[in-house]
């Protein structure tokens, strides 16, 4: 099934991919993205591990109703989470060479 040294090469490639994957996972965890809502009136900065680092609220919103502000904060958090997911997909595609994963399967495994 495998030619001479084929299995060894396959194992070496798998180890290299695993090493690259670990590096990318560390890079993703350190990255930060900013999600926005209300045309930038609310901004949420989130890490690649989905931890919220900062919430920035324009002062003009503090005079408005509480419910609208809560909605904008939630929308900004969701936007930041979406951006984290997009960045993760891009970084993982670099490692996997664009190989598509089966639906529902997320990286890292």
Curated annotation (Swiss-Prot):
Locations listed in the record: Cytoplasm, Nucleoid
Keyword Iron among UniProt keywords: no
Pfam family, any one: YbaB_DNA_bd
Keywords (A to Z) from UniProt: Cytoplasm, DNA-binding
SUPFAM superfamilies the UniProt entry points to: YbaB-like
GO MF term list: DNA binding
Predominant localisation class: cytoplasm
Record region (Disordered): 87-109
One CC-aspect GO term: bacterial nucleoid
NCBIfam families noted in UniProt: DNA_YbaB_EbfC
Function: Binds to DNA and alters its conformation. May be involved in regulation of gene expression, nucleoid organization and DNA protection.
Family: Belongs to the YbaB/EbfC family.
Subunit structure: Homodimer.
Full protein name: Nucleoid-associated protein Shal_1591
Organism field: Shewanella halifaxensis (strain HAW-EB4)
